[in-house]
Amino acid sequence: METRPPAAPAKLSYGIRRGGWTRIGAATVAAGKKAAGDLDPRHHHHRVTHGGDGGGVGGGGSGGQEEADEQQQQQHDHHRLLQLHHHQGVQQDQEPPPVPVFHLQPASVRQLSGSSAEYALLSPMGDAGGHSHHHQHGFQPQLLSFGGVGHHHHLHQFTAQPQPPAASHTRGRGGGGEIVPATTTPRSRGGGGGGGGEIVAVQGGHIVRSTGRKDRHSKVCTARGPRDRRVRLSAHTAIQFYDVQDRLGYDRPSKAVDWLIKNAKDAIDKLDVLPAWQPTAGGAGAGNAAAPPSSSTHPDSAENSDDQAQAITVAHTAFDFAGGGSGGTSFLPPSLDSDAIADTIKSFFPMGGTAGGEASSSTTAAQSSAMGFQSYTPDLLSRTGSQSQELRLSLQSLPDPMFHHQQHRHGGGGGGGNGTTQQALFSGAANYSFGGGAMWATEQQAQNQRMLPWNVPDPGGGGGAAYLFNVSQQAAHMQAAAAALGGHQSQFFFQRGPLQSSNQPSERGWPETVEADNQMSHHQGGLSPSVSAAIGFAAPGIGFSGFRLPARIQGDEEHNGGGGGNGDKPPPPSSVSSASHH
C-alpha cells in the first residue's frame, strides 16, 4: 500500500476535467494520465497509483481504489476553490480546449488556458502558492464574472517571481484587449470619459450631460414669440443639410447653419426686418383693421398652434364685417397699445372696478383693446379675465347657418327695426367696441361691459356681428331680438350653448333668458338706446363673473355697485339667476 509512483507522473488527477464540475473515478484518472503524459508535480500533493502499477503489485488494485477515494475527497473539499480557480488542472505543456467557465466567452477561456504555463511557474511552492492564488480570486470573484481577467493577471504580477511577471504582464495586456472589455470599457468610460464627453459635446448634443439635454429643450425668443431651439426638417431638406455639413467638415449642425447664414447674408439683408414682438404689436392690427388683419396677423398667430389658427380664421371671418360705416375705422381703437394689452393679459380674474355704469373710458379702452387683440391672439385673450376673456373663445365657432339665414331674413335693411334689434342682440359689441352702428356707438361706448365673443356675420352691414352679449345690455338686446327672431332664437342659443363648455350654467341661462325676454319683448318691442342701456346694466342675463357664473350682470352686487340703474331690473332676473345657478 505504500508503493506510489514517482511524483512527476501523478500530480493532477483532474487535469483533463472539463470545467471543474464533475468528479472522476480511478479509471478516468488513469486514462487522463495516459493521454496527458507527465504532469507537473508542483500542482498537487495527491499521488495516485498508475493503473499498470496496480496490476503489477498485488495490492495495486486496492491501493488505486484508496487513492481514487482520497482524490475524490480532496476534490470535494476543494470544490469551491476549483470553481474560482479553473486553471489549476491545466497542464504546462498541453492546453485543453477552451471551455466556457464562469460565463466567460470562449475567447476569454482560451486566453486563460494560454497562460496556464505561467500559472504553473507562479506556484513554485506547491499548494501554498496555489492556495494563495485561490484566495486572491476568492476575494475578488466578481472580477471574473464580468471579465476582470486583466486584473487577475495583475494579481499574479505582484505574487510571481521576477521573470514570470513580465510574461504575465505581457499576456495580461494582450488579454486586456481581447477578454477584458468590461474592465477596460469602464476605464475608457472613466478615463476616456472626458474624451467621450467632449466628443458628445462637439457633436452639439451634450448627450452625456443632463444639463445639455435640458438645454436642447430650451426656447429662444423670436419676432413671433418663444420658439423651440430644435428644428425639424423634412427628409429631403435634412439630407441636403447633412450633406452640406459633411462637406464642410463641421461636427455640429449649428456650425453648418452659421455658415449658410453667413454666406446668405446678402440675400438675408434684402428681406424685411420683422418687429421685435409681433403678438403684442397691437398698433399693426389697428392700422390694418379693415382688411389687412387677416394677412398681417393671422399667419403670425397661426404658426403658434393649429387651434389658434382655426380660431383666428373664424375671428377674422367675423371681423371682416367692418365694411360699413365706422366699424372699420374703429375696429381697433387708438387706445390699443402694448400697455393696455399687457394689463388685459395679466388680469386672469375679473376686476370689480371695470363693471357696471362706473366703467371709465380707460376701462372701455382696455376692454376694446382686449376685444380687438382677440382678433389675432385668441389664445391669450381666452386666458385673460378682463371683461370677455374668461368667456372662452370656444364660442368662436363658425357662424350658425340657421342664424345667418335669420339675419338676412329679419335684418336685411341693415338699419331697420329688425337689423337694429339684432345689433342689440349682439350687444353692439362692434358698435361701441369697434365703432359700428351710428346710433348705438355713443350710448354704448361708456357702457362697455364684459362681452361674450360670438362670431356671427354682420346682420346689417354696420357692425354688430363679432360679439354677442355686452353683459350690460344682453338681456334687453335678447328681449328685442327674441321678438324679432321668435322661437328660432331660443333654438339658436340651445345650439350655441354646448360651445360654452367652461360656462355650463350660462348655457341653461341663455335660453331661459330668451324665453323670459320673449314675454317682455311684447311690451318693449322698440327699445331706445337709453332704455336698453338701463335695462342692460340691471338685466339678469348671463353675467360672467370670473369662473363662477352668476346669472347677474357681472354680479350686479359685486361690480355694478349702486350705479348703472340697479333699480331698473326687470322681473326676469330672479328666474334666470336661479336657472343659471343650478
Curated annotation (Swiss-Prot):
Pfam families: TCP. It is found in: Nucleus. Residues 30-78, 123-195, 283-306, 402-423, 548-582 are annotated as: Disordered. InterPro entries: TF_TCP_subgr, Transcription_factor_TCP. Residues 51-64 have a biased composition (Gly residues). Keywords: Activator, Developmental protein, DNA-binding, Nucleus, Transcription, Transcription regulation. Signal peptide: none annotated. Residues 213-271 form the TCP domain. The keyword Transcription applies. GO terms for molecular function: DNA-binding transcription factor activity; sequence-specific DNA binding. PROSITE patterns: TCP (PS51369). GO terms for cellular component: nucleus. The keyword Hydrolase does not apply. Forms homodimers and heterodimers with PCF2. Transcription activator. Binds the promoter core sequence 5'-GGNCC-3'. This is Transcription factor PCF5. It comes from Oryza sativa subsp. indica (Rice).
